[in-house]
């Protein structure tokens, strides 16, 4: 039987039963358009009271003949470098950004093209800073940023397995806010390592997603496939409001650590760790974004790699030697997903004869070995 049913559709056991497609579309569209773009940018640097200031500003223009929309996007960044004993820099950036839609974004679920669609707009506010310091006699750098982004004319989309389907209309507003922190430096002398932590929240509000809950004469909510009495006698209108966007991954942690063998610095080890909280998901093919509030399991992954410098640019070789034409030659071996963790990428929804659906996870690649050689001229 097909993988999206639990046996009630089985052509081999029911040879005279027709298998009708659940949903079919046949469309044709021809789109011809032209884009005209341009930008202007200027930077100023000046000093006052032993503080160095930098201003970088510009504006970008975009005109698209498809919807006859002229977009003007100003943006600016100001940084301040005080004359302190510690090397610290502060910066603030803001701007208006537009994203004209691609073909898939102005094509709705039924294959119709919306030629009146507008570009999505985002207003950014970013406050950040850099701090360079020394620890254990070695250089390090700390980078931190706080940001808030407000978006309107948003084109919502839903994820069906690994397929992205857009609504084809500007019917939502959204926001994203969070903090990014990163430290990189020589945790081991002569090698670069880093650790990063990010916390983010992004939500959207569809302007036309109100729906009704239907009640039977016993006052119970009618749920097809679950309730016995499915005759509605009353209804309640529900406005979902703000819901998580498909990219709402609350916490992300990454670590990259490199080291080398004390007696052989040409032989190095690289260790990478990733952790991310679960992404939202919901039932498929219902075009009801407010139901996509379930969460996948967290993403966890550990990679390890070893690299050996076979040929060093510092060592001279005879030109007649075939390897003498290369500066460096590296041999690398990597093991991806070392702990063989099953990370969920999407869900396959299986339906039974009552209409109930069950989410079966699809997993990313398991443990994998990769070997490569790198030649540098």
Residue ranges and their predicted role:
Residues 1, 57-61, 78, 92-96, ...:
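Transmembrane beta-barrel strands of outer-membrane/channel proteins
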Residues 24-149:
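Structural signature of Gram-negative outer-membrane beta-barrels, strongest in the C-terminal barrel
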Residues 30-36, 70-72, 121-125, 173-177, ...:
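Residues that define the transmembrane beta-barrel architecture of outer-membrane proteins
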Residues 46-53, 82-88, 134-140, 189-190, ...:
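Short loop/turn motifs that connect adjacent beta-strands in outer-membrane beta-barrel proteins
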Residues 48-49, 148-150, 170-283:
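Gram-negative outer-membrane beta-barrel transporters
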Residues 83, 118-189, 198, 204, ...:
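Membrane-embedded beta-barrel scaffold of Gram-negative outer-membrane proteins
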Residues 274-285, 308-377:
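C-terminal beta-signal and adjacent terminal beta-strands/loops
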